[in-house]
């Protein structure tokens, strides 16, 4: 595909002028109406730091989720008075002054359930309702019931929810899909964006922007009425992601927006805070201390921004795959994020047209077309033959292949010849016996080899099918489903991530133990079951032998760990 003509930057500068002024107004309006609850590290100050550093709980998220029994200022004053007294017991002080999160009741599924029956039975188990919360609770109230991922995750998560909703729709629970869309719209109206999760300590960042795709999913059931109903919230979310663009000069970045030297507008992940994450406090402090050559605030921001990406953590963000303290998320322009922004612009155009505003629809189409050219120019590695992230420091596309490279295919932003090359690269470098590898690098981080994640399996499967690459798409689905089934047969559960180097093993690495449940795995499994089995003969388990005979592709043996360039 040709690069954009040299005259385009000036033209593009004119295009967004009026539309971005509108967005700036929307963003200010959202800020004015938002009531921002303070996260526990601010509410509790030195007490929070001391409790986390004392490692009273195996999981740092436990105290971040604890609810103060009275005004935090009073608790803090009591702490300052008592902490230096002889015999002071910090654990006792915490137990007296806080209500700790309860352990969820262990769900024991009925015996003899098929995989599909198990998933259908889990939806009510994973459903929560928090219309009201305690005054100083870090949990943010939501007007409708919602489905949580499972395990340590006691709240709703933004991008997880889209893949969970795919499964809810597949199970016929359109009411739950509608409820979750309404909840996210409520968050946009209340806070100006959708936070990472419904916790006060997640408010400083978002996650991969799937809200427009959620509305599009709901429109499959409700028609254009859903698009028209949620157009204002989709516009507000777009304003959040593009906040600051109207003041950007070429070569500058502001929050989540990047303006390259030729005027191309792209996006990056960003967190508004540059402190340790409350839910991983001690770990973040240790990471920052391990690299004294970088300001701690810079490392904290990049750790938080990696959490905003959903890929926390991955060699994708790091200069040295074996050293987390070399991550620099904010200087990388991600291919998956910009694909999702392209899709958001396309859905906004469709929704504007449905609402009768053809002029606005044309503006969004123009923005989407400009972004598509930017993706093709800056996020394609011609030498390697795959999509990749762009490095703002080296001013070059990066060399590393990751599963994020399938996102341009998923949103129909890829050129056909490049989609064909992506199919080859996927089959050669990422396809494994148990599904699609996240990267080909073994770093010990959870978003690296040998782990495979349900959302990335589905993005790849859908993306490849969009471009007629059914053979590789079906290979991914079959390998991943076999892995899920083998694990379920042995453990009687679905898990957050899987080791794809073989089948039947949950994934490892990362900051916490493997979690079961698990929302997005449930959703993707249902979608894939219906993909591999003919409609006239739906399957409740993964068949022992492959139903479709179009493909006999074997995955190429993966190379050992490759360094990130």
Swiss-Prot record:
Task: List the EC numbers from the record.
Answer: 3.2.1.28
Instruction: Please provide one cellular component term from the Gene Ontology annotations of this protein.
Output: periplasmic space
Q: Which UniProt keywords apply?
A: Glycosidase, Hydrolase, Periplasm, Signal
GO molecular function terms attached to this record: alpha,alpha-trehalase activity
Q: Which superkingdom? A: Bacteria
Q: Does the keyword Cell membrane apply?
A: no
Question: Does the keyword RNA-binding belong to this entry?
Answer: no
The signal peptide annotation in the UniProt record is: 1-30
Q: Where is this region: Disordered?
A: 539-565
Q: Spell out the Gene3D superfamilies in the cross-references.
A: 1.50.10.10
Question: Where, by residue number, does substrate bind?
Answer: 152, 159-160, 196, 205-207, 277-279, 310, 511
**Which reactions fall under this protein's catalytic activity?**
alpha,alpha-trehalose + H2O = alpha-D-glucose + beta-D-glucose
Location of this chain's protein in the cell: Periplasm
Supply one GO BP term: cellular hyperosmotic response
Task: Tell me the Pfam families matching this sequence.
Answer: Trehalase
Catalytic positions?
312 (proton donor/acceptor), 496 (proton donor/acceptor)
The UniProt similarity line reads: Belongs to the glycosyl hydrolase 37 family.
Its assembly, as annotated, is:
Monomer.
Task performed by this protein: Provides the cells with the ability to utilize trehalose at high osmolarity by splitting it into glucose molecules that can subsequently be taken up by the phosphotransferase-mediated uptake system.
Name of the molecule in the record? Periplasmic trehalase
What organism does this protein naturally occur in?
Escherichia coli O6:H1 (strain CFT073 / ATCC 700928 / UPEC)
Encoding gene (name): treA
């Amino acid at each position: 595909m040709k690069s954009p003509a040299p005259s385009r930057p000036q033209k593009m500068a004119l295009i967004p002028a009026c539309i971005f002024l509108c967005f700036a107004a929307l963003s200010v309006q959202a800020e004015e109406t938002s009531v921002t609850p303070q996260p526990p590290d601010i509410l509790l100050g030195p007490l929070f730091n001391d409790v986390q550093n004392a490692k009273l709980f195996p999981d740092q998220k436990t105290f971040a989720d604890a609810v103060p029994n009275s005004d935090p200022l009073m608790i803090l004053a009591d702490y300052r008075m008592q902490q230096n007294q002889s015999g002071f017991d910090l654990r006792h002080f915490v137990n007296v002054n806080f209500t700790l999160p309860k352990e969820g009741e262990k769900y024991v599924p009925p015996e003899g359930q098929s995989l599909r029956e198990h998933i259908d039975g889990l939806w009510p188990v994973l459903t929560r309702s928090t219309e009201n919360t305690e005054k100083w609770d870090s949990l943010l109230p939501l007007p409708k019931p919602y489905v949580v991922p499972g395990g340590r995750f006691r709240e709703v998560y933004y991008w997880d929810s889209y893949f969970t909703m795919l499964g809810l729709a597949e199970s016929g629970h359109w009411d739950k899909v509608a409820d979750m869309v309404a909840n996210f719209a409520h968050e946009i109206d209340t806070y100006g964006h959708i936070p990472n999760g419904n916790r006060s300590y997640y408010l400083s960042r978002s996650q991969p922007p799937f809200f427009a795709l959620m509305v599009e999913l709901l429109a499959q059931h409700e028609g254009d009425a859903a698009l028209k109903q949620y157009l204002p919230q989709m516009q507000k979310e777009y304003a959040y992601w593009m906040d600051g663009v109207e003041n950007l000069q070429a070569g500058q970045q502001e929050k989540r927006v990047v303006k390259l030297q030729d005027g191309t507008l792209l996006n990056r992940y960003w967190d508004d805070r540059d402190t340790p994450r409350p839910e991983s406090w001690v770990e973040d402090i240790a990471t920052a201390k391990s690299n004294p050559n970088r300001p701690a605030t810079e490392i904290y921001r990049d750790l938080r921004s990696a959490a905003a990406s959903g890929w926390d953590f991955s060699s994708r963000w790091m200069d040295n795959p074996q050293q987390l303290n070399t991550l620099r998320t904010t200087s990388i322009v991600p291919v998956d994020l910009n694909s999702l922004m392209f899709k958001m612009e396309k859905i906004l155009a469709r929704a504007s047209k449905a609402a009768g505003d053809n002029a606005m629809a044309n503006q969004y189409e123009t923005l989407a077309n400009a972004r598509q050219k930017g993706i093709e120019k800056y996020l394609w590695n011609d030498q390697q033959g795959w999509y990749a992230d762009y490095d703002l420091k080296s001013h070059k596309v990066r060399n590393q292949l990751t599963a994020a490279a399938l996102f341009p295919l998923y949103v129909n932003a890829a050129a056909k010849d490049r989609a064909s090359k992506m199919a080859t690269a996927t089959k050669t470098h990422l396809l494994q016996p148990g599904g699609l590898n996240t990267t080909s690098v073994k770093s010990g981080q959870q978003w690296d080899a040998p782990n495979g994640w349900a959302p990335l399996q589905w993005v790849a499967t859908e993306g490849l099918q969009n471009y007629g690459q059914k053979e590789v798409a079906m290979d991914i689905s079959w390998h991943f489903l076999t892995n899920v089934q083998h694990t379920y047969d042995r453990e009687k559960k679905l898990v957050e991530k899987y080791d794809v180097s073989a089948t039947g093993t949950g994934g490892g690495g990362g900051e916490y133990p493997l979690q079961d449940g698990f929302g997005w795995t449930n959703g993707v499994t249902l979608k894939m079951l219906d993909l591999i089995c003919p409609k006239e003969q739906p399957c409740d388990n993964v068949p022992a032998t492959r139903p479709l005979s179009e493909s006999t592709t074997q995955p190429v043996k993966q190379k050992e760990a490759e360094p990130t360039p």
